[in-house]
């Protein structure tokens, strides 16, 4: 039997806010291919832990490893470069942009053809990501404002998947903070 490889490890993670201990001594191992759920009451620290893993908050104490290397992202962009992304319950899509522009927001230089953006190439790559999440009928050139709420949330998931796929270790960790609570 093949032994699963450890992808993510956190040890003794703690988070203290003024007057509040949000997390205390959290240990967590996530192996490649594994699906892990964090269950607890409101205020138990689940979202705080996810924000620490994504680099949105710095733990008061503890350490993390990703693919066996020290992991301490300072922001979500740095976490993405190391293969970690997060889909939030609240949507962050820019409604006056197209689906493809949202999926590749901040990465437009990849599609630059001189001073112009090659939207055809961008939309081709965006369609491949949309297909992956079951949105074959959603066209990358469509305005986000024309999508229903549930489809927008699936575009959020596609955006995160696209953002974490090009890193050195090839395996990604996708964090989900109640992203499907609004879906059909």
Question: How should these model regions be labeled?
Answer:
Residues 2-184:
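Glycine-rich phosphate-binding loops of nucleotide-dependent enzymes
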